[in-house]
Amino acid sequence: MTDIINKLQAFADANPQSIAVRHTTDELTYQQLMDESSKLAHRLQGSKKPMILFGHMSPYMIVGMIGAIKAGCGYVPVDTSIPEDRIKMIINKVQPEFVFNTTDESFESLAGEVFTIEDIKTSQDPVIFDSQIKDNDTVYTIFTSGSTGEPKGVQIEYASLVQFTEWMLELNKSGNEQQWLNQAPFSFDLSVMAIYPCLASGGTLNLVDKNMINKPKLLNEMLTATPINIWVSTPSFMEMCLLLPTLNEEQYGSLNEFFFCGEILPHRAAKALVSRFPSATIYNTYGPTEATVAVTSIQITQEILDQYPTLPVGVERPGARLSTTDEGELVIEGQSVSLGYLKNDQKTAEVFNFDDGIRTYHTGDKAKFENGQWFIQGRIDFQIKLNGYRMELEEIETQLRQSEFVKEAIVVPVYKNDKVIHLIGAIVPTTEVTDNAEMTKNIKNDLKSRLPEYMIPRKFEWMEQLPLTSNGKIDRKKIAEVING
């Protein structure tokens, strides 16, 4: 595959009435997707700045993506859940010529001409448009959190997206024209893992409604109505869905492939999924936004579960060469690496290198290569110092999850005068806690055999489930707010 757009057009010509994208009761066929995106592309033609794509889980968000790619300008997805001040920061940074508002609400942009869905539907522009995108053009820019509070716009080139899509289709064992499930909002690059491999293989992209993110029963209704074949989500979202006793192979026999990315896949969750879907293909993948979604993968089997108490993230893919610094920081090199941060030379220079035409990115993740597999060992910036000891919060969390009494865990440092004074563990227990002191004692006894005393949390807070962000990741900030009152 050398071009995603040509691939989509060829499938649309051969199968015009096949459903390309579905969200609740809204659907677009491949013919509609290509026609509407062409009309949008005519309006964007000649623009040298990325289009702001505003909305949530709407089929017309996909129209916006394909239209912006055809026009060659690329897009910046902005989710409706993002705070207004952050939206303003993004628009100020991008200074777009065009904004595509896919919501029913008015959207006043600080810059750029605003189009609506109705504008495109009623447009008399031609439904044929020859794609203008080039391999080295920026296809999308996704804004991630910045340490200074200002979001950073990660620019990904078209050739990187094409290469990633090809790799995903090589991993995919389910074949073409499958029903894919996408959990992630479009401002989160995990969504790329579902969108382009699905459409490039003639599949139907099924979008999880935002109301389902913390309500697995609503997802159950969706899965019952639509026989999903391929599931793409964060591990945390899948763990929440495992609260449904009906989520198993017997109930959903069509569900035969899972892709996870965005955060660590806990061993306990993977074990439960393998048990419930013994015939399914399950992939654990790893990658930062700055390296086009994912750069490693491993198929999780019972053999892998038995061999590794902490799951590896697998081996590198084409376009990504992995290594570590002397301090253990993971470095990614190759075509998968981003073009840098939009209009932020200082931050780009801190973590990217483009010498001799080779792109490298320092991830900030600690990693090791062992037994032919890569392992992620936490974030460098998740290190804290307590009583003179430097430690990794994620190491403590990993050991907590090994306890028979712990289903899920997050460790929160408690500060006083900008100094960490002790640790608290937010715990989802495997059984109901009837005796707080006894449960605390049991968990601490488990930890004492694996961690030094100074790394053991002083106390634990019990939670029914860990809250998730709109991206489907564990919401560490909210947990800290709850614990610190």
UniProtKB/Swiss-Prot annotation:
Gene Ontology biological process: lipoteichoic acid biosynthetic process
UniProt GO MF annotations: ATP binding; D-alanine [D-alanyl carrier protein] ligase activity
Top-level taxonomic group: Bacteria
Binding residues for D-alanine: D189, V293, K473
Listed EC numbers: 6.2.1.54
Catalysed transformations (reactions): holo-[D-alanyl-carrier protein] + D-alanine + ATP = D-alanyl-[D-alanyl-carrier protein] + AMP + diphosphate
Binding residue positions for ATP: T144, S145, N284, T285, Y286, G287, P288, T289, D365, K473
Stored SUPFAM superfamilies: Acetyl-CoA synthetase-like
Enzyme class: ligase
Compartment(s): Cytoplasm
Major location (coarse): cytoplasm
Pathway involvement of the protein, from the record: Cell wall biogenesis; lipoteichoic acid biosynthesis
Keywords: ATP-binding, Cytoplasm, Ligase, Nucleotide-binding
Pfam families (alphabetical): AMP-binding, AMP-binding_C
One GO CC term, this protein: cytoplasm
Function, as annotated: Catalyzes the first step in the D-alanylation of lipoteichoic acid (LTA), the activation of D-alanine and its transfer onto the D-alanyl carrier protein (Dcp) DltC. In an ATP-dependent two-step reaction, forms a high energy D-alanyl-AMP intermediate, followed by transfer of the D-alanyl residue as a thiol ester to the phosphopantheinyl prosthetic group of the Dcp. D-alanylation of LTA plays an important role in modulating the properties of the cell wall in Gram-positive bacteria, influencing the net charge of the cell wall.
Family to which this protein belongs: Belongs to the ATP-dependent AMP-binding enzyme family. DltA subfamily.
NCBIfam families cross-referenced by the UniProt entry: AA-adenyl-dom, D-ala-DACP-lig, PRK04813.1
Protein name, as recorded: D-alanine--D-alanyl carrier protein ligase
